[in-house]
């Protein structure tokens, strides 16, 4: 079998010195999914908040775990199937709070947004 190789624009990013994320930052499909994901992730957090209001204290952790799985699935969809955000983030829950008081999901999106905006400008 012969092999055909070309530059597809795929770039590799090391996340927090550990996990590896691969995608084409200049792909308008990735940017469109990223914008859509912002709303989907907000909706997942709002759903968690609603569920937590009536949940027993012992159920809160399970609700957060379910929301984390859902949110990581959204991120896997945004950046492509070869990326596994459970592995990329080394198991950290996206709803965890960073040292500055912001959620990990908020920090991740704030960090990725400029990369995607710059890529979208090249299209």
Question: What are the residue ranges of the model-derived segments?
Answer:
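Short N-terminal mixed-charge amphipathic segments
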Residues: 1-60
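Generic ordered-secondary-structure signal
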Residues: 2, 6, 16, 20-21, ...
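Low-complexity, compositionally biased segments
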Residues: 10, 19, 27-30, 71, ...
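Non-catalytic, well-ordered alpha-helical scaffold segments
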Residues: 32, 68-73, 106, 110
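Charge-rich, low-complexity alpha-helical coiled-coil segments
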Residues: 54, 61-62, 120-123
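Short coil/turn segments at secondary-structure boundaries
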Residues: 59-66, 96-99
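Short, structured surface segments that line ligand/substrate-binding pockets
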Residues: 62-78
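C-terminal charged interaction modules
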Residues: 77, 82-123
């Amino acid at each position: 079998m012969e092999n055909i190789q070309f530059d597809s624009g795929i770039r590799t990013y090391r996340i927090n010195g550990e996990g590896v994320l691969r995608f084409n930052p200049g792909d308008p499909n990735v940017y469109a999914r990223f914008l859509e994901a912002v709303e989907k992730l907000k909706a997942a957090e709002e759903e968690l908040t609603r569920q937590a209001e009536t949940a027993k204290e012992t159920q809160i952790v399970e609700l957060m775990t379910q929301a984390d799985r859902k949110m990581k699935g959204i991120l896997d969809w945004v950046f492509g199937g070869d990326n596994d955000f459970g592995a990329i983030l080394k198991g950290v829950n996206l709803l965890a709070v960073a040292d500055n008081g912001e959620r990990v999901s908020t920090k991740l999106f704030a960090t990725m947004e400029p990369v995607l905006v710059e890529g979208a400008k090249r299209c």
